[in-house]
């Protein structure tokens, strides 16, 4: 199986950065991208000519803020009317619109046309990029992957992430929780030195999400005891506070409001992100942005103390899930053997300090790389699930939990829980319900997730009707409802009337915002089309480069006395004119088609090559070897650099 399918990879699909790993040669390799970076920005940009993903997209964001999309993870699996989506929209430079089924759609301009994308499609583009990074490294096509999600992601967010995988053309072997993946990285790292059962708390604070999980690890068994978190808290929120602070400072100093200018805000945000990172290692830093707004330069200093003060409520908010998680796991904080830090935002000294104080001064574990631990664990799980691991990992067993209670609505809008939160998955629970009134012909099964006593305060996942119940007094019919959660944390619900044998079932996939099979197929086709367009752009650039290279090489070759001196003035002029014509043509036709570049190069070669070849034959004498030295202009060789008037 391992050979036919190629290797399976592990992808940490992050809010701000993503990372990919693979199990190879008895260990995990975290794979660098084409820029040499081991993490890739989760950014997709659309321009008049092309689509950019990753570093290329993030690097041009200040020039093109309206059409550069990021934070898709803060939209995925959420409804447009969700308050967090509405709040985020105020901060994003790109436009998000609603749709008839309350699904947020990202609106951008691509090649001069308005296009709408779902969060799943944007995430799928990032997944494709991560797959390509892995394929370039492994040298073969990759089909199978394990993709991670925050432990506190709900059912619809998980399903939407799985759909993103399908659109990207990946076969998602499993959706696993980020803290659990990080625990695998920690567990393998510490495997040799440990005996007996260990309680480990994973504190995962990333760019956009926050999770806390408690696991017991023993002999390769990773059992999650409890999980808690906030799917909308992370490094970006700390950046936002700093951006707001400097916007008001700019207003105070210059009496001008930059909050309506997307480009100025983006440049400020980039500077704030950099300043935040610097403040993790120094006590004070400066922000310097030339001509930020209406020609005004902006210089400001910020101290670590000021940064901590403006985010203090958010830092404290990070401690609440830690307490909740310990309570749910029924573990006292003194019984936690190791506190493991994951996610880039755990580098913030104040977060360290608060966590250390909470655990009464206990040393925190910093032995695993906070940016790569999740992808590392996902790669291990991918190897196990695809049967490619070795004895080192084969005996690993992951027992994860469902983060939110699941149940259905009974008379009076009461939430009746079938599966309490922190139940180990996969799991299956059945319960018998009955009718509420005499001769009731059917029952409406409404499935909710959440911890509140009334369903109106919880999240509706989906509903379906079980009809065809024979007339009977209330309380007589027996309706058996079965909740079944698979290993991805995705729920199936079925209901059956025991007496009449009527059955109905639903895969709870948040019917409202869920993509249908047809929509996913259409998006897969779109994705293939965009990929083909990207390839086309790449070919154009290569053809243009090839022609440019050849023309400049030729120009330099005839300037070289050793060669130019051997040409007759006529021949020299002929080549010079042809080269100048080609360079002129290039300047006016940057956007030409591939075949135009190729024809132009053939035309130029047709003029130059015979003259150069003749010269070499003359130089070599009859029967002599043709010297192919450094002087011969090879297409693709770097030009000689000299002053050209």
From Swiss-Prot:
One of its GO terms (biological process) is protein refolding. InterPro entries: ATPase_NBD, Heat_shock_70_CS, HSP70_C_sf, HSP70_peptide-bd_sf, Hsp_70_fam. GO terms for cellular component: cytoplasm. SUPFAM superfamilies: Actin-like ATPase domain, Heat shock protein 70kD (HSP70), C-terminal subdomain, Heat shock protein 70kD (HSP70), peptide-binding domain. Residues 627-639 have a biased composition (Low complexity). PROSITE patterns: HSP70_1, HSP70_2, HSP70_3. One of its GO terms (molecular function) is ATP binding. The keyword Protease does not apply. It holds the Pfam family HSP70. Keywords: ATP-binding, Nucleotide-binding, Stress response. Residues 620-645 are annotated as: Disordered. It comes from the Eukaryota. The keyword ATP-binding applies. Transmembrane segments: none annotated. Belongs to the heat shock protein 70 family. This is Heat shock 70 kDa protein. It comes from Glycine max (Soybean).
């Amino acid at each position: 199986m391992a050979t036919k399918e190629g290797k399976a990879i592990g992808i940490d699909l992050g809010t701000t950065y993503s990372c990919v790993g693979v199990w190879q040669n008895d260990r995990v390799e975290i794979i660098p991208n084409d820029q040499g970076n081991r993490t890739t920005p989760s950014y997709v940009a659309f321009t008049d000519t092309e689509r950019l993903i990753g570093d290329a997209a993030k690097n041009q964001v200040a020039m093109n803020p309206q059409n550069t999309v990021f934070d898709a993870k803060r939209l995925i699996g959420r409804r447009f009317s969700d308050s967090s989506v509405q709040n985020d929209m105020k901060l994003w430079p790109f436009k998000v619109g609603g749709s008839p089924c309350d699904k947020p759609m990202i609106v951008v301009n691509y090649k001069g046309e308005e296009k709408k994308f779902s969060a799943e499609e944007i995430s799928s583009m990032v997944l494709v990029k991560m797959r390509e990074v892995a394929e370039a490294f492994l040298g073969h096509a990759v089909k199978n992957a394990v993709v991670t999600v925050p432990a506190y992601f709900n059912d619809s967010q998980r399903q939407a992430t799985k759909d993103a995988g399908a659109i990207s053309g990946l076969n998602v072997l499993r959706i696993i929780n980020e803290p659990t993946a990080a625990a695998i990285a920690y567990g393998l790292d510490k495997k040799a030195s440990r005996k007996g059962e260990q309680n480990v708390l994973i504190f995962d604070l990333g760019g956009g999400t926050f999770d806390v999980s408690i696991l017991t690890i023993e002999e390769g068994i990773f059992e999650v005891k409890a999980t808690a978190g906030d799917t909308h808290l992370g490094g970006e929120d700390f950046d936002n506070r700093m951006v707001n602070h400097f916007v008001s400072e700019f207003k105070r100093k210059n009496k001008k409001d930059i909050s309506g200018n997307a480009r100025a805000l983006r440049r400020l945000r980039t500077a704030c992100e950099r300043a935040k990172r610097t403040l993790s290692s120094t006590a004070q830093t400066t922000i310097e942005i030339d001509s930020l707004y209406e020609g005004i330069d902006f210089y400001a200093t910020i101290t670590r103390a000021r940064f901590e003060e403006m985010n203090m409520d958010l830092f404290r908010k990070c401690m609440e899930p830690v307490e909740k998680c310990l309570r749910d796991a029924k573990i006292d904080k003194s019984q936690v053997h190791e506190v493991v830090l994951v996610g880039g935002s755990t580098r913030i000294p104040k977060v360290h300090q608060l966590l250390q104080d909470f655990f009464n001064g206990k040393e925190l574990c910093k032995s695993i790389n906070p940016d790569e631990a999740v992808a590392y664990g996902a790669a291990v799980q991918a190897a196990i699930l695809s049967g490619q691991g070795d004895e080192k990992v084969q005996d690993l067993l992951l027992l994860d939990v469902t983060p939110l209670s699941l149940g259905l609505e009974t008379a009076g809008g009461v939430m009746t829980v079938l599966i309490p939160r922190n139940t180990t998955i996969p799991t299956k629970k059945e319960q018998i319900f009955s009718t509420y009134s005499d001769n009731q012909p059917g029952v409406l099964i409404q499935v909710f997730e959440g911890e509140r006593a009334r369903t109106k305060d919880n999240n509706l996942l989906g509903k379906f009707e079980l009809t065809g119940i024979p007339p009977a007094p209330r309380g007589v019919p027996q309706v058996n409802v079965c909740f079944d959660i698979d290993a991805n944390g995705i729920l199936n619900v079925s209901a059956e009337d025991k007496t009449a044998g009527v059955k109905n079932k639903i895969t709870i996939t948040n019917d409202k915002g869920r993509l249908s099979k047809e929509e996913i197929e259409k998006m897969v086709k779109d994705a293939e089309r965009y990929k083909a367009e990207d390839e086309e752009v790449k070919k154009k650039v290569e053809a243009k480069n090839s022609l440019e290279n050849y023309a400049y090489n030729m120009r330099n070759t005839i300037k070289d006395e050793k060669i130019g001196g051997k040409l007759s003035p006529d021949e020299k002029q002929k080549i010079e004119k042809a080269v100048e014509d080609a360079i002129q043509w290039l300047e006016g036709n940057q956007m030409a088609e591939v075949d135009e570049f190729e024809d132009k190069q053939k035309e130029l070669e047709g003029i130059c090559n015979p003259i150069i070849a003749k010269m070499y034959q003359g130089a070599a004498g009859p029967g002599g070897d043709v010297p192919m030295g450094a002087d011969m202009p090879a297409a693709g060789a770097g030009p000689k650099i000299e002053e050209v008037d």
